[in-house]
């Protein structure tokens, strides 16, 4: 079976590169250095216009944990409504309770809204912060999600490979388990081999130098670890390489 790649794209431009490299679908977000947050309406609109492969929109209103206030929950619903209007094929969600369990009532409402519009739903890496991942697996399946994005409860998917393999076995085809987190052309073959996953998630990004001629290097506008003159973007070449390496040892 061919291994497919979902690219975590931090902009419409990255989504275009993902498609050019052969990705099967895109998870569109912003602020990857914070783990990803909901992309702007403009990013969604332009990506939808320019990219033909399925567009999955991350619904995460802020960085940090996945315990949301009432206002934050209303923001998530409003963003979902816009995704429906924009013609996006899918959304990526995840809300937890304070005790580390899945917030089933809120997630159920989001899934109902999405499914009514014919959307595919992925439960994102909030799953990795659950107190009991196997109970969370059953909860997410019962809610009607189509896919779980997970690093196996570790920082990277390769570190969590054994847990991912257990989750895939436990899921038994009831839901797609998609490894993500630090996936690259250098570890994807091992990840596929160890887990048995058939779909992989990666940003496949590179750092691109700004085209600015004048550069004021005496000021940092954003976070201290960001360089205003370096930009992260998905690389079509890296997308191709990851797909090739993922499938290199697969039977014809």
Spell out what each predicted region is.
Residues 1-11, 59-77, 96, 121-133:
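Active-site mouth loops of central-metabolism enzymes
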Residues 3-7, 26-28, 55-59, 91-93, ...:
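Hydrophobic faces of well-ordered beta-strands that scaffold small-molecule active sites
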Residues 13, 32-56, 71-74, 95-115, ...:
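Active-site-adjacent beta->alpha loops and helix N-cap segments on the catalytic face
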Residues 20-26, 51-54, 87-90, 116-118, ...:
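Glycine-enriched alpha-helix->loop->beta-strand junction motifs that scaffold or abut catalytic
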């Amino acid at each position: 079976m061919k291994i497919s790649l979902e690219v975590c794209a931090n902009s419409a431009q990255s989504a275009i590169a993902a498609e050019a490299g052969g990705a099967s679908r895109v998870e569109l977000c912003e602020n990857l250095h914070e783990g990803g947050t909901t992309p702007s309406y403009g990013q969604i609109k332009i990506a939808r216009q320019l990219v033909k492969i399925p567009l999955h929109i991350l619904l995460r209103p802020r960085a940090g944990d996945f315990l949301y206030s009432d206002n934050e929950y209303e923001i998530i619903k409003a963003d979902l409504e816009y995704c429906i209007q924009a013609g996006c094929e899918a959304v990526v969600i995840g809300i937890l309770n304070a005790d580390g369990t899945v917030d089933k009532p809120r997630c159920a409402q989001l899934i109902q809204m999405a499914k009514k519009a014919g959307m595919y739903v992925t439960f994102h890496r909030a799953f990795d912060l659950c107190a009991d991942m196997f109970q969370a697996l059953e909860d997410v399946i019962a809610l009607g999600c189509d896919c779980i994005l997970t690093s196996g409860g570790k920082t990277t998917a390769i570190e969590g490979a054994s847990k991912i393999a257990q989750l895939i076995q436990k899921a038994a085809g009831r839901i797609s388990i998609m490894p993500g987190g630090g996936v690259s052309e250098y570890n994807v073959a091992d990840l596929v081999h160890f887990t048995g996953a058939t779909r992989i998630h990666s940003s496949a990004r590179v750092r691109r130098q700004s085209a600015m001629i004048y550069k004021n290097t005496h000021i940092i506008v954003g976070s201290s670890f960001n360089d205003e003159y370096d930009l992260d973007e998905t690389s079509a070449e890296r997308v191709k390489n990851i797909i090739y390496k993922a499938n290199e040892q697969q039977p014809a």
